[in-house]
């Protein structure tokens, strides 16, 4: 793997902040901002991409009435949910599942972010099955779909993407295949 200067600096920064007592939720937000704040990190509507994970984490937070470990994991994963998938484009370097582990995020958060990340071998049905079987990933995907299909964002969606999101809703929320 080529030298990853920015990624390695980010890992060290997060490790140092964690050592000084920063919470996972704050650290997840810092990582998301670092990865999604470059000049390439603009969504299809011309809005800075960081606003998407901010909204997704807010939706996750609104789903809970009392603090729990599930909420904490889902909130952190919501901030991080596109970091692995989009880091090469937005950050200029890959951020991997192993990098998130090195930063100290717990296994449930790291696993959920990994499950939510599409790779080059992405097969939709397998992707949805993996998410459906992970409580944290499913909550984050619900919040992600809620944001992606909101009137604020959906005006910039093409028909293929709208159809794909409907399939995701059907499978993950309504438990219907097809």
Question: Model-derived features: where do they sit?
Answer:
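Active-site helical microenvironments for divalent-metal-assisted chemistry
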Residues: 1-178
């Amino acid at each position: 793997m080529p030298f990853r200067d920015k990624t390695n600096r980010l890992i060290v920064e997060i490790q140092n902040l964690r050592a000084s007592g920063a919470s996972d939720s704050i650290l997840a937000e810092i990582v998301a901002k670092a990865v999604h704040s470059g000049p390439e990190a603009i969504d299809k509507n011309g809005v800075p991409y960081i606003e998407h994970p901010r909204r997704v984490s807010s939706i996750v937070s609104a789903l809970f009435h009392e603090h729990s470990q599930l909420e904490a994991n889902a909130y952190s994963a919501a901030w991080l949910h596109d970091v692995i998938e989009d880091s090469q484009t937005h950050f200029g370097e890959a951020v991997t599942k192993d990098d998130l582990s090195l930063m100290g995020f717990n296994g449930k958060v790291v696993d959920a972010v990994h499950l939510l990340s599409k790779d080059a071998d992405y097969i939709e049905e397998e992707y949805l099955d993996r998410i459906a079987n992970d409580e944290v990933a499913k909550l984050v995907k619900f919040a992600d779909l809620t944001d992606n299909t909101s009137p604020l964002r959906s005006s910039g969606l093409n028909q293929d993407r709208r159809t794909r999101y409907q399939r995701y809703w059907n499978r993950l929320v309504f438990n219907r295949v097809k």
